[in-house]
């Protein structure tokens, strides 16, 4: 019996395996497959294994859907596969890895911006109330 994992885990000449997103879907309706592929292959080209899927457009409940096969992702990382930046972020949000530093920074910026908008809106409402009282 032949073990396929040893065949797939062998060194790939001229590159390495990468876990990345492969674009699918239609115009204005993207859909991504999470795949293990050689880094020299095109983005939507041949891949070794599909590890999940990602739908970036929110559904009717406002959710972006992600399906991951964490056992196989763990296997390919153990075989030396690299991760693309978007995959690092997705796996950080799923709890598989620690959060990517840019995700934390972006969340802090968004929180400050929203707090500033709320403060400006309340100040504007107060100034309008004072103007109506003065009139």
From Swiss-Prot:
A Pfam family per the record:
Ribosomal_S16
Instruction: Extract the coiled-coil ranges from the record.
Output: none
- Top-rank taxon: Eukaryota
Q: Which SUPFAM superfamilies match?
A: Ribosomal protein S16
Asked whether the UniProt record includes Heme among its keywords, one would answer no
One GO cellular component this record assigns the protein to is: mitochondrial small ribosomal subunit
Q: Which GO terms describe its molecular function?
A: structural constituent of ribosome
Per UniProt, subcellular location reads as:
Mitochondrion
Q: Which UniProt keywords apply?
A: Mitochondrion, Ribonucleoprotein, Ribosomal protein, Transit peptide
Question: Its Gene Ontology biological processes?
Answer: mitochondrial translation
Organelle targeting sequence: 1-34
Please give the HAMAP family that the UniProt record associates with this protein.
Ribosomal_bS16
Recorded hits in PANTHER family, A to Z, give: 30S RIBOSOMAL PROTEIN S16 (PTHR12919), SMALL RIBOSOMAL SUBUNIT PROTEIN BS16M (PTHR12919:SF20)
- What family is reported? Belongs to the bacterial ribosomal protein bS16 family.
Question: What does the record note on quaternary structure?
Answer: Component of the mitochondrial ribosome small subunit (28S) which comprises a 12S rRNA and about 30 distinct proteins.
Q: Which NCBIfam families match?
A: S16
Query: What is the protein name given in its UniProt record?
Result: Small ribosomal subunit protein bS16m
Native source species:
Mus musculus
């Amino acid at each position: 019996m032949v073990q396929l994992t040893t065949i797939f885990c062998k060194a790939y000449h001229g590159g390495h395996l990468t876990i990345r997103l492969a674009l699918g879907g239609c115009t204005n309706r993207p859909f991504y497959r999470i795949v293990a592929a050689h880094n020299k292959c095109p983005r939507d080209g041949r891949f070794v294994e599909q590890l999940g899927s990602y739908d970036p457009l929110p559904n009717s409940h406002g959710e972006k859907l992600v399906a991951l096969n964490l056992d196989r992702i763990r296997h390919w990382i153990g075989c030396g596969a690299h991760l693309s930046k978007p995959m690092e972020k997705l796996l950080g949000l799923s709890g598989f890895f620690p959060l990517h530093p840019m995700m934390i920074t972006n969340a802090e910026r968004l929180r400050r911006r929203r707090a500033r908008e709320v403060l400006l809106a309340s100040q504007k409402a107060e100034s309008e109330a004072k103007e109506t009282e003065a009139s």
